[in-house]
Structures are given as structure tokens and as C-alpha cells.
Regions:
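S-adenosylmethionine/decaboxylated-SAM
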Residues: 10, 96-290
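Rossmann-like AdoMet
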Residues: 2-99
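Intrinsically disordered, low-complexity regulatory regions of eukaryotic regulatory proteins
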Residues: 1-2, 122
Length: 290
């Protein structure tokens, strides 16, 4: 009787999860106005219902955007983007854990920026499964310099489970409500690069920027995964914050290949003194050598 009861409980839990999953996928189909055939594929076969992964078609625009924002040579940035796209070892490691191809999307821009600027401390607020963290940690490993502090409300192994063991030597994970854990982190760390990829509500994103503002060193870079075009009405949270802090803001939208998602806006903010000196050539780079 006990076995039957447990079996029925597991069955009901599985059925409830499947209903929830179908509901999420139907929401996606409606929100993104997915064509009928692709909608059926999403409903029946896609394992992803959010945090979609895909390759992008406009990597050339990405290197141009990063060069425009930072003043770093475009060819250097394009080279770093090609580096991660062609890193067969990294792709094989992640694909083996992910059970599907590793598609970084806009995160290749994070990689290129880290390779070029060599930050000592990167903070990613909102790690999720760790795909972005893999790109960040790979860049830090190539630099032989720096560490990543990942934050998420969900503890491991639910978060950051994609990260291969050899990349974890530069990784620190902080579980808990970011509204509570971020202030304590700022008191003990000098954040060179902050990536907002957590709760995308305006209130929560603004809270993160408010917390980090007094602790950002000169030359710090702030990235948002949910920005909007420059001058958008209303402006996105990162642009508003950048204006308030007299910082430079720019953004770019990725173009997913073969996916119904329209692509995220990659926003970046840095000191105006960096972008205005020597035609943007004043971007801070950590020159510590391995």
C-alpha cells in the first residue's frame, strides 16, 4: 500500500509538472506569435521553455558595438568572439553535460569583453544553469587572471551545474536572495565587471545598481541582459542609471538563428571619462600579467 501511495504521489507530481510545462510553452507561443508548425515543434520537442539557447547571426555587429562602446580595436574583439566559437574542447564539455549543443548567443560578447579588459573580479547576478558562467570562466582561464562570483536564489546543484570541474577553480557561488547577499559582497569585493542577469523586473534591476554604485571602482563596467535601444521611450533601467551616474550607455540586440525568440538587448555602461578620452581609447584594462 505504501509503495502504491508513493507511486501515485510521484505520478501526480510528474503529471502536474507536465501540465505546467505545457502551459509555459503555450504562453511562449502566444507571446512570441510563433508560426503553427514551429509552435507544434516547440510544444512537442523543445526541452527549453525559458532561458533559450541559440547561435546568433550578427557577431560582426557585436564586435562593432563593443568596439564603439569601449574603444577597443574591433578586430581584437572579433578575434576573441571567434576564439570561443571555435573552442571545441569547451563546446564538447558543455554539450556532454547539457545533452545538446552549447550555444552561447550574446554571451560570446561577455567572453570577448573579459578577454580584452582582463577584470580581476566579475560578478554575475543570476547564474541559472551556468551557461554564461562557462563563457566567463573560460575567458578568465585564458587570461590566467581573475575570478567569477556567481549569485542565484537557487542553491547548487540546481544552479551552475553546467560548469566543468576544471573551470570551478576561479568560481565562487553565493546562494540566496540577491537583495540580501549583494550588499555583503560589495563590502568585501572590488567589482570590475557586473552582469545583471537575474530578476528582470525594473524594481529589482534598479535595486542591484543602487547597491553596487558606491562600491564601483573607476573603470568598472556594468552589463544588463535586458536593456533596450539607446533613447528608447521609456528608457531601460540601465540607461536611466547611467544617466543618473553620468556614465556612458550603449546597447545592441542579438539576432538568433532558427529560433522564434526575437533576441535580447545587451546593454553596457562605463565611465564617460573612459569613452571620451582619445576617441574611446581610455577604456580600463587590467594589465596584470600571468
Amino acid at each position: 500500500v505504501l509503495d502504491e501511495s508513493l507511486g501515485m504521489k510521484n505520478f501526480r507530481h510528474s503529471l502536474s509538472h507536465k501540465k505546467w510545462l505545457i502551459g509555459r510553452k503555450i504562453d511562449n507561443i502566444r507571446f512570441y506569435n510563433v508560426p503553427p508548425v514551429r509552435a507544434l515543434q516547440h510544444l512537442l520537442f523543445d526541452v527549453e521553455y525559458d532561458n533559450f539557447t541559440y547561435d546568433i547571426s550578427n557577431c560582426d555587429e557585436l564586435s562593432q558595438f563593443l568596439s564603439r562602446a569601449t574603444g577597443i580595436n574591433e578586430s581584437e574583439l572579433a578575434g576573441y568572439i571567434a576564439e570561443i566559437l571555435n573552442d571545441e574542447t569547451l563546446h564538447t564539455e558543455i554539450s556532454g553535460r547539457f545533452k545538446r549543443p552549447a550555444r552561447f548567443g550574446r554571451r560570446v560578447g561577455w567572453y570577448a569583453l573579459i578577454r580584452a579588459t582582463r577584470p580581476a573580479v566579475v560578478v554575475e547576478a543570476g547564474v541559472h544553469d551556468g551557461l554564461g558562467a562557462c563563457a566567463i570562466l573560460s575567458a578568465l582561464a585564458k587570461n590566467n587572471h581573475g575570478k567569477l562570483i556567481g549569485m542565484d536564489i537557487q542553491p547548487e546543484p540546481g544552479s551552475a551545474w553546467l560548469i566543468p570541474p576544471h573551470l570551478r577553480t576561479r568560481f565562487e557561488f553565493i546562494a540566496g536572495d540577491i537583495a540580501e547577499t549583494l550588499p555583503a559582497l560589495c563590502e568585501r569585493e572590488r567589482i570590475d565587471l557586473f552582469i545583471h542577469d537575474s530578476d528582470h523586473s525594473e524594481i529589482f534591476e534598479a535595486m542591484e545598481y543602487e547597491v553596487i554604485t558606491p562600491h564601483l571602482p573607476q573603470g568598472a563596467i556594468v552589463i544588463s541582459d535586458c536593456a533596450a535601444p539607446v533613447g528608447n521611450i521609456p528608457p531601460c533601467v540601465l540607461e536611466v542609471w547611467a544617466q543618473q551616474q553620468n556614465r556612458h550607455f550603449d546597447s545592441w540586440q542579438e539576432k538568433p538563428i532558427g529560433h522564434f525568440y526575437f533576441g535580447a538587448h545587451f546593454g553596457i555602461s562605463l565611465d564617460k571619462s573612459q569613452t571620451e578620452s582619445s576617441g574611446n581609447a581610455g577604456i580600463h584594462r587590467n594589465v596584470t600579467q600571468p
